[in-house]
Amino acid sequence: MSEEKVFPMTAEGRDKLQAELEDLITRQRPEITNRIQIARSYGDLSENSEYQSAKDEQAFVEGRILTLKKMIENAEIIDPNATAADVVSLGKTVTFKELPDEEPETYAIVGSTESDPLAGKISNESAMAVALLDKKVGDKVSVPLPSGESIDVEILKVEK
């Protein structure tokens, strides 16, 4: 018997997935169904690009709906209060600097479904997060890089 994959995420992340799911079901799915019906009215489906395009989009949307349902159903909501205030954990925001003297950087550590490095959210599965998790303010950690080298960082601040 296979175990379902658990998707760790914040309550905010789950809410965003739920909103996307609702949009797909209530807005996008009916729009695509309508486009398919209109395209069918054009006759021969074998050379009907509007029909093929709508069917392709329908397949994508239905697949995304199934994926979102599974992710929401198997969501493990992260409680940043479950660990000490100064300990890095999922759902917390950590400020660190690369040693010896780089500028501080701040990222929230979130589940992989929510990661968006450009928005300051890194996946708990990333090398940086793995190195920082369960460490405390003042700790210095080594973060492996894809090149095989590593960088040293110091944790400056942890926030919920």
Curated annotation (Swiss-Prot):
It comes from the Bacteria. PROSITE patterns: GREAB_1. Keywords: DNA-binding, Transcription, Transcription regulation. SUPFAM superfamilies: FKBP-like, GreA transcript cleavage protein, N-terminal domain. Pfam families: GreA_GreB (PF01272), GreA_GreB_N (PF03449). GO terms for biological process: DNA-templated transcription elongation; regulation of DNA-templated transcription elongation. InterPro entries: GreA/GreB_C_sf, TF_GreA/GreB_CS, Tscrpt_elong_fac_GreA, Tscrpt_elong_fac_GreA/B, Tscrpt_elong_fac_GreA/B_C, Tscrpt_elong_fac_GreA/B_fam, Tscrpt_elong_fac_GreA/B_N, Tscrpt_elong_fac_GreA/B_N_sf. One of its GO terms (molecular function) is RNA polymerase binding. Belongs to the GreA/GreB family. Necessary for efficient RNA polymerase transcription elongation past template-encoded arresting sites. The arresting sites in DNA have the property of trapping a certain fraction of elongating RNA polymerases that pass through, resulting in locked ternary complexes. Cleavage of the nascent transcript by cleavage factors such as GreA or GreB allows the resumption of elongation from the new 3'terminus. GreA releases sequences of 2 to 3 nucleotides. This is Transcription elongation factor GreA. The lineage of its organism: Bacteria, Bacillati, Bacillota, Bacilli, Lactobacillales.
